[in-house]
């Protein structure tokens, strides 16, 4: 079953994400992973679009500062590189791989070309200006950047930090529920690569937790939602990571129960599903954001939302979850009732 995204979702629907309930610009932060294009060149390409000043701390830590939107960061996967440094792995590996021990740059270059991605972390950008992000993707592609599908080893992804229309728990939870309902359909549309599915970054929520959340009677207080989420998901490793927004709501509870997790508090969903298809000619990140539009369309339609919630819960109660049947039901619902 393959529903091509070419597209049941028209670009005009992206405008539904432009504003908050208070009629302010909604923003999305983007993190994109790739290889085969050095960070300084990447920063120069971004500067052509976003202006600003390039500041090179090291070859693997570069910033584009003072753009209209804030600062961009260009770096080797920071957590993995820090872990290697903390464990003194560069020196240990140097004893194994000989000459490379005398040339850290060569070693890191070799590592990043095979396993560790370069990453661009963008500041929050108004969704109405998202075309500039697509322009950067095009420049990266034309200059040789490689993405997820180039190699089985490349479990590279795109992370979208999507600002909800409000911080009200019911609004946020309604979108969270809608995502869980549509996730399998979105995975088909987004063509999530198997290398990413087996990587330790985008694990699914448990059936027990999904059943709890999808129940039409589940409309907890913000405090109860936080407690339930942390009880079931004491990890960043979720396809839709809610810990950043929970930290934004209550940083103390994160520090208390998850002191070892590195969490930057943000007033956003941290959506980690999409592949980084930066080397594919017809792909742009806005296509992934358009899929999120469907989540919001479902959340905003009370009748369809309630029907799909009940149907999904019924499917989950079955001994065997028929994924293809559910994907087809989602597709028909979207075509007939949401678009």
Protein language model regions, located:
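C-terminal accessory/tail domains of diverse enzymes
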Residues: 2-118, 125-135, 142, 166-167, ...
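Short His-Asn-centered micro-motif
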Residues: 123, 161-163
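Active-site palm subdomain of RNA-directed nucleic acid polymerases
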Residues: 142-151
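Short, conserved phosphate-binding/catalytic loop or strand-edge motifs used
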Residues: 152-159
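Structured core elements
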Residues: 159-161, 270
């Amino acid at each position: 079953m393959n529903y091509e995204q070419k597209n049941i979702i028209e670009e005009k629907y992206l405008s539904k994400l432009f504003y908050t309930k208070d009629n302010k610009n909604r923003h999305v932060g983007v993190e994109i992973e790739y290889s085969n294009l050095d960070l300084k060149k990447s920063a120069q390409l971004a500067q052509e679009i976003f202006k600003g000043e390039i500041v090179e701390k090291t070859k693997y830590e570069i910033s584009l500062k003072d753009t209209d939107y804030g600062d961009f960061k260009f770096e080797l996967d920071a957590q993995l590189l820090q872990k290697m440094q903390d464990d003194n792995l560069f020196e240990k590996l140097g004893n194994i791989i000989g000459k490379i021990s005398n040339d850290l740059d060569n070693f890191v270059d070799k590592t990043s070309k095979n396993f560790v991605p370069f990453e661009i972390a963008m500041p929050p950008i108004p969704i109405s200006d998202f075309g500039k992000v697509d322009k950067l993707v095009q420049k990266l592609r034309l200059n040789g950047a490689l993405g997820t599908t180039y190699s089985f080893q490349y479990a590279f992804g795109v992370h979208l930090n999507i600002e909800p229309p409000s911080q009200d728990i019911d609004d946020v939870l309604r979108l969270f529920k809608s995502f869980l309902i549509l996730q399998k359909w979105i995975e088909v549309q987004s063509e999530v690569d198997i290398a990413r599915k087996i990587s330790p970054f985008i694990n699914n929520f448990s059936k027990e937790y999904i059943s709890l959340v999808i129940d039409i009677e589940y409309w907890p207080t913000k405090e109860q939602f936080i407690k339930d989420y942390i009880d079931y998901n004491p990890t960043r490793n979720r396809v839709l990571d809610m810990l950043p927004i929970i930290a934004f709501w209550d940083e103390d509870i994160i520090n208390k129960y998850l002191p070892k997790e590195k969490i930057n508090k943000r007033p956003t969903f941290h959506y980690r599903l999409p592949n980084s298809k930066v080397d594919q000619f017809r792909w742009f990140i806005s296509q992934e954001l358009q899929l999120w539009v469907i989540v919001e369309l479902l959340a905003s339609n009370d009748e369809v939302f309630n029907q799909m919630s009940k149907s999904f819960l019924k499917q989950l109660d079955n001994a065997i979850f028929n994924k293809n049947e559910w994907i087809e039901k989602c597709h028909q619902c979207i075509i007939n009732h949401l678009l």
